[in-house]
Regions:
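Short amphipathic alpha-helical surface micro-motifs
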Residues: 12-13, 25, 44-46, 85-88
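Short, well-ordered, aromatic-rich surface patches in folded extracellular/luminal domains
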Residues: 18-34, 74-76, 87-143
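A short, sequence-level motif marking secondary-structure junctions
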Residues: 45-48, 66-68, 118-124
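A short-motif feature that recognizes glycine-rich, charge-decorated loops
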Residues: 51-85
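N-terminal export/targeting and maturation segments
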Residues: 18-54, 60, 64
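Bacterial Sec-dependent N-terminal signal peptides
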Residues: 1-25
Length: 143
């Protein structure tokens, strides 16, 4: 009887932990664009956005963001299954001929980094397009 009760309690705690939304929190987003000789990395965390560029126009700027801005980014990410981001297909392939910058979107969630495959900057897969646009819109205030 004690064993059955103990097993029941363990199962209930396990089930509750798996459904806890806080256990699956997003820590940061990164959007990187690159080509031969230059890269730009946009990193968004709950309290700031950082833009770092290398190459001829190298710069590094950080701007604080508020909770409303962070929540707007989280809202755009809410429809994305981050565990399947690496399976998303790029709608175009202009980066192969240097007609567009390469771009990669990364999401850090529970100390795991999920990334898309490379896609054309300015034309992300439709599943992540609202999130990419929100990050770039927020970054306009940094550069």
């Amino acid at each position: 009887m004690k064993f059955t009760f103990l097993a029941f309690v363990l199962i209930m705690f396990s089930a509750n932990d798996c459904s806890n939304p806080e256990a699956a929190s997003i820590e940061s987003f990164s959007y990187e664009t690159f080509t031969r000789g230059s890269t730009t990395m946009y990193t968004v965390t709950p309290d700031q956005i950082k833009v770092k560029s290398t190459g001829v126009n190298a710069l590094e700027n950080i701007v604080n963001i508020n909770e409303t801005e962070w929540n707007a980014i989280l809202e755009k990410a809410s429809n994305i299954d981050v565990s399947k981001m690496s399976q998303l297909k790029s709608p175009t392939d202009s980066r192969a001929s240097d007609a567009a910058l390469h771009a990669i979107l990364s999401v850090r969630k529970n100390d795991t980094i999920y990334k898309t495959n490379s896609f054309d900057h300015g034309n992300p897969p439709t599943e992540v397009k609202p999130l990419v646009e929100a990050i770039l819109r927020l970054a306009e205030n940094v550069e």
